[in-house]
A protein has these predicted regions:
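N-terminal subdomain of nucleotide-sugar transferases
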Residues: 1-76
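A structural motif in glycosyltransferase catalytic domains
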Residues: 37, 44, 222, 237-238
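Carbohydrate-associated surface elements
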Residues: 57, 175, 194
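A short, charged, and often flexible helix/loop element on the N-terminal side
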Residues: 70-99, 147, 151
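Short N-terminal targeting/anchoring amphipathic segment
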Residues: 96-117, 127-134
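Nucleotide-sugar donor phosphate/pyrophosphate-binding loop at the beta->alpha transition
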Residues: 130-132, 141-161, 171
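A short helix/loop element that forms part of the nucleotide-sugar donor recognition site in Leloir-type
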Residues: 201-215
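Conserved donor-binding/catalytic core segment of Leloir-type glycosyltransferases
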Residues: 215-232, 238-242
């Protein structure tokens, strides 16, 4: 991953930094944000940085965190209806302040914009800790897919206020950066998503698996990975596949 932005210059400015990531979703949950953060944490630790994570307690099997674990702190959360396994974090200003006074991070990265994230931004600012935010999900755009389009201006107004309070906002693509800047969001930088070339490599090509798909060595296998949901823009994926079929080659 690479990012020409303030947070990355601060991370690289010293031999080791303590970075605290505040998020409502994290492995073993399976979704894009959780996987992205897992790779970010692994990459930072590989570079010698200390990374701690604050996330909501998912279920009773999560061990209670009655003291400040320097790696993972569990806070109160509520399940999100219709989104199994994910909890929205409740405000946790006192818990965060206690943890950060005991193990003060050099910077805080707030990956999600819920009540937990809002309290993290306020607490970090009160303690004069640099705080950055991540814009991972277009929640304001999702509303129109669930007959709540009238809420879109209110949701985006909240998101804009949230991110404007932080030192900078990290987004996954240049396109999203440009769109956010066009609507008045400042200090937006790109934290690109890398590709694990050890995992995604032709060396892992499996003829037996392709045979079960009915795909020959000369054919191109087209795969969609993700939830089947309105906001995933599956129509575009289908249109892209149809366009590929009009070209040369065999696809499946």
């Amino acid at each position: 991953m690479s990012a020409p932005c303030a947070i990355w210059s601060q991370v690289n400015a010293a031999d080791q930094r303590h970075i605290c990531i505040v998020t409502e979703t994290y492995p073993p949950e399976v979704n894009g944000v959780a996987m992205t953060l897992a790779h970010l944490v692994a990459g930072l630790r590989t570079q010698g940085h200390a990374v701690s994570v604050v996330r909501p307690r998912r279920q009773s099997s999560d061990s209670r965190s009655d003291h400040c674990d320097p790696e993972v702190t569990l806070v109160r959360g509520l399940p999100i209806p219709g989104y199994e396994g994910v909890h929205v974090g409740l405000p946790a200003g006192r818990v965060l302040q206690g943890c950060w006074l005991q193990h003060r991070p050099d910077m805080v990265y707030v990956a999600t914009e819920g009540p937990l994230g809002w309290s993290a931004v306020r607490t970090a600012q009160r303690l004069r800790i640099p705080v950055f935010s991540g814009f991972h999900t277009n929640f304001h755009s999702y509303s129109k897919h669930y007959r709540l389009g009238w809420l879109q201006p209110l949701i985006f107004s909240y998101l804009r206020r949230f991110h404007q309070r932080t030192t900078g906002t990290l987004v996954p693509s240049v396109d999203l950066r440009d769109r956010l800047q066009a609507v008045g969001l400042n200090n937006v930088s790109v934290l690109g998503r890398g590709v694990d070339c050890q995992l995604f490599t032709p060396a892992r090509r499996c003829a037996a698996l392709r045979h079960t798909w009915g795909v020959s060595d000369r054919d191109l296998a087209v795969l969609y990975v993700g939830r089947v949901a309105p906001e995933k823009n599956l129509g575009l994926a289908v249109a892209a596949y149809r366009a590929m079929q009009q070209g040369r080659g065999s696809f499946r």
